[in-house]
Swiss-Prot record:
It comes from Mus musculus (Mouse). GO terms for cellular component: cytoplasm. The modification Phosphoserine is found at residues 69, 96, 98-99, 162-163, 214, 248, 293, 335, 384, 388, 396, 402, 470. Keywords: Coiled coil, Phosphoprotein. This is Glucocorticoid-induced transcript 1 protein. Residues 97-106 have a biased composition (Pro residues). The keyword Coiled coil applies. Pfam families: FAM117. Residues 1-45, 62-254, 309-407, 495-520 are annotated as: Disordered.
Length: 537
């Protein structure tokens, strides 16, 4: 062991080999080494042995290394195995490797029967659990503890963090590193696909606000009660002011009276029904009213008590109270910004006691009614007496307000008159269908529909040509062939009725043109009779 200690002091880098040799040593020899300089410093810490907490100080790696030792006796191996099984519930009593106060080393004669009888502690494990600072630098156990603690730390750090190559490689390619050992509280996010976190916070705030409003906290119930009281008071004051407007014969003095009464009862109430405020900001309205109302009380009370003439110009733009004169009724002098509806029943939702005091209402929209534009259109239609649903500012080309829905051509295009061009083309194209070809037929018009024709060939082809080129273009070529066959059949029928020979029956075919004209007229007058005759034959 002296040679081992000297060699270990000379070569400090061969510490893992010394760990296996120290575990392979016999118990008396290892106990004998405790009588050296390390054993001299051990009794100094005997008083602090009972104050140490119960800790499992034998790691799994030392137990695994002790199983592979070839020269260790069986008793020490079984004791170490039993100590490993009891290390969880507190079988090993000793400080951690970094503790500065080691337990005292007992005598080797007492340690050997304890290791055999009770598997409490072995002398090597007790000596191994002591701190390396109190040991001599030449002892082999001191060389064992340092690489053991370093190995445990490096293994734990490798589990928690990934190496530098795994971080820089995907990071330079544009991908975020994903370490499987580290458990993040949320899933991995990419900046290109995720929205800002403030959006999610705003959505959560909105959701929580709606939920608290639905369940109703104490502050919100108070605000709702205040809103209801203000609405009721505004309705009552509007009713009183309307009754006074109807009863009072004056046009301007009762305005200030209603002002003073409304202010004397309470601060100027604000009608919330006329303000288009979202639901989330309704809860903020009482704070604004309470902050503005003391200043308004001072201003209006001072003006009404001192000078009534000062408050009158303030109420002139608000024209709901006094009826409009007759010359104001013309629709040409009205506009939405300057006029208000004259019918009081239609503006019943309007407030009629004070100009708008909330910061939500601009001074241009002091009429407060949500249907002011509809009232204006209604009054215009009522004044002009027209029942047309279209507004008056539409362009009407005719004096009787009948609208011609014509679309103007776009810029750079000409207006095309479609119907006039079609009407001009029709008389030109109509005679082309009824005129016969002058190259084929020569006729002399006598005023009748059927004209005498100069035959250029034999009888039957000439009559066929004449019937095809007749002015009655509605007859088809089948009808023309039908009439030719009827003519020949009539000639043959008359010849057969005379009981003449077949040679004599060919003679009536060469009769005079006067007989042919009579036959043609008979055919045209009695068409239906001729069709029946043709069917019978």
């Amino acid at each position: 062991m002296s040679t081992a200690s000297s060699s270990s002091s000379q070569t400090p880098h061969s510490a893992p080999q010394r760990m296996r040799r120290s575990t392979a040593g016999s118990p008396p020899a290892a106990a004998g080494s405790g009588t050296g300089p390390a054993g001299s410093c051990a009794p100094a810490a005997g008083a602090g042995r009972l104050l140490q907490p119960i800790r499992a100080t034998v790691p799994y790696q030392l137990l695994r290394g002790s199983q592979h030792s070839p020269t260790r006796p069986a008793a020490a191996a079984t004791a170490a195995a039993a100590l490993g099984s009891l290390s969880g519930p507190g079988g090993a009593r000793g400080p951690s490797p970094s503790s500065p106060t080691p337990p005292p080393a007992a005598a080797p004669a007492e340690q050997a029967p304890r290791a055999k009888g009770r598997p409490r502690r072995s002398p090597e494990s007790r000596r191994r659990s002591s701190s390396p600072e109190r040991r001599s630098p030449g002892s082999p156990v001191c060389r064992v503890d340092r690489p053991k603690s370093q190995h445990i730390r490096t293994s734990s750090t490798i589990r928690r963090t990934s190496s530098l190559d795994t971080i820089t490689g995907p990071y330079l390619t544009g991908q975020w590193p994903r370490d499987p050992h580290v458990h993040y509280p949320s899933c991995m996010r990419d900046k290109a696909t995720q929205t800002p976190s403030c959006w999610a916070e705003e959505g959560a705030e909105k959701r929580s606000h709606q939920r608290s409003a639905s369940w109703g906290s104490a502050d919100q119930l108070k605000e709702i009660a205040k809103l209801r009281q203000q609405l009721q008071r505004s309705k009552q004051s509007s009713r009183h002011s309307k009754e006074k407007d109807r009863q009072s014969p004056l046009h301007g003095n009762h305005i200030t009276i209603s002002h003073t009464q409304a202010i004397g009862s309470r601060s100027v109430p604000m009608p919330l029904s006329n303000i288009s405020v979202p639901k989330s900001s309704v809860s903020r309205v009482p704070c604004n009213v309470e902050g503005i109302s003391p200043e308004l009380e001072k201003v209006f009370i001072k003006e009404n008590n001192g000078k009534e003439e000062v408050s009158k110009p303030l109420d002139i733009p608000d024209g709901r109270r006094a009826p409009l004169p007759a010359h104001y009724r013309s629709s040409s002098t009205r506009s939405i910004d300057t006029q208000t509806p004259s019918v009081q029943e239609r503006s019943s939702s309007c407030s009629s006691h004070s100009p708008c005091v909330s910061p939500f209402c601009p001074p241009e929209s002091q009429d407060g009614s949500p249907c002011s534009t509809e009232d204006l259109l209604y009054d215009r239609d009522k004044d002009s007496g027209s029942s047309s649903p279209l507004p008056k500012y539409a362009s009407s080309p005719k004096p009787n307000n009948s609208y011609m829905f014509k679309r103007e051509p776009p810029e750079g295009c000409e207006r095309v008159k479609v119907f006039e061009e079609m009407a001009s083309r029709q008389p030109i194209s109509a005679p082309l269908f009824s005129c016969p070809d002058k190259n084929k037929v020569n006729f002399i018009p006598t005023g009748s529909a059927f004209c005498p024709v100069k035959l250029l060939g034999p009888l039957l082809p000439a009559s066929d040509l004449m019937l095809k080129n007749s002015p009655n273009s509605g007859q088809s070529s089948a009808l023309a062939t039908l009439t030719v066959e009827q003519l020949s059949s009539r000639v043959s029928f008359t010849s057969l009725s005379d009981d003449t020979s077949t040679a004599d029956s060919l003679e009536p075919s060469a009769q005079q043109p006067s007989q042919q004209q009579q036959l043609l007229q008979d055919l045209q007058v009695e068409e239906h009779v001729s069709t029946q005759n043709y069917v019978m034959i």
